[in-house]
Amino acid sequence: MSVSGLPFDDFRTLLRELPGPDARALAAARERDAQLTKPPGALGRLEEIAFWLAAWTGRAPAVNRPLVAIFAGNHGVTRHGITPFPPAVTQQMVENFAAGGAAINQICVAHDLGLKVFDLALDYPTGDITEEAALSERDCAATMAFGMEAIAGGTDLLCIGEMGIGNTTIAAAINYALYGGSARDWVGPGTGSEGDMLERKIAAVEKAVALHSDHLDDPLEIMRRLGGREIAAMAGAILAARIERIPVLIDGYVATAAAAILKAANPAALDHCLIGHVSAEPGHLRSIEMLGKTPLLALGMRLGEGTGAALAAGIVKAAAACHSGMATFAQAGVSGKH
């Protein structure tokens, strides 16, 4: 990416010039669906998913190279005792991913999904958002650019996930800054915060948003001031996927916060995205509703790691398989609707 003016300038340009869906591929998918051996609409959302795949890939619905991308980052705000786990767990879980021992590894095996994990300077936590910006504009833009590389190896379905102790606090701050209400509306237990710890978490979100209140009219400023490296990288990955016409499945509360930044910058920025699941984190459903989306799954999960998006990838693969593999009425010798 070229450097022109301020670090965010290139991203602002990209967000203004997003490609739209492929109307011809969408029409072809609808035409084929009408000929398949089933009543119209009988596959419900599977049909809509197939149409979504066609519209954004520009071809018949297919998922041949699905990929889960996990972005890991650490946060200075954890020093306020807002989470029961130490920041060292982020690095330990990255190592667990590499060893194949995490839940996401098992889901990827079960659904034949690729997996990439991006370690985002874990030894250098972001700034404490209650006292300063999480990132400089230059660092935030560089991390977005790094996130865009998630698709470099090729994929036709990108599942976005994260790992980062303290990042549900970050997600809550972003949602509070974007949508208002109260900090308590957006803060949940995360990895298990309760009692006094939960109150400290709420207080941290309140203090952070108040500190940066003069800069909340710009979504990219919200991201750099209240976000984190995994937030910036996920936003970059989602943006890169749009440019390359790759459909995206977004995971939980934290990944949705990254997506919300893009939506605030351009209302059409998430048209190529579906929400994989609604997590048990209380603010997630509210955040999804603010995006105008409907999650594919509701399993009471709150793990992160891209697990909900990865499970939803199995549904997307099934939708594509039904669309491409089912016989038409003519092929099967089945009578159509009179």
UniProtKB/Swiss-Prot annotation:
SUPFAM superfamilies: Nicotinate mononucleotide:5,6-dimethylbenzimidazole phosphoribosyltransferase (CobT). Pathway: Nucleoside biosynthesis; alpha-ribazole biosynthesis; alpha-ribazole from 5,6-dimethylbenzimidazole: step 1/2. It catalyses: 5,6-dimethylbenzimidazole + nicotinate beta-D-ribonucleotide = alpha-ribazole 5'-phosphate + nicotinate + H(+). Its EC number is 2.4.2.21. InterPro entries: Nict_dMeBzImd_PRibTrfase, Nict_dMeBzImd_PRibTrfase_bact, Nict_dMeBzImd_PRibTrfase_N, Nict_dMeBzImd_PRibTrfase_sf. GO terms for molecular function: nicotinate-nucleotide-dimethylbenzimidazole phosphoribosyltransferase activity. It comes from the Bacteria. It is an enzyme of class 2 (transferase). Keywords: Cobalamin biosynthesis, Glycosyltransferase, Transferase. One of its GO terms (biological process) is cobalamin biosynthetic process. Pfam families: DBI_PRT. The active site is at E305. Catalyzes the synthesis of alpha-ribazole-5'-phosphate from nicotinate mononucleotide (NAMN) and 5,6-dimethylbenzimidazole (DMB). Belongs to the CobT family. This is Nicotinate-nucleotide--dimethylbenzimidazole phosphoribosyltransferase. It comes from Rhizobium etli (strain ATCC 51251 / DSM 11541 / JCM 21823 / NBRC 15573 / CFN 42). The gene is cobT.
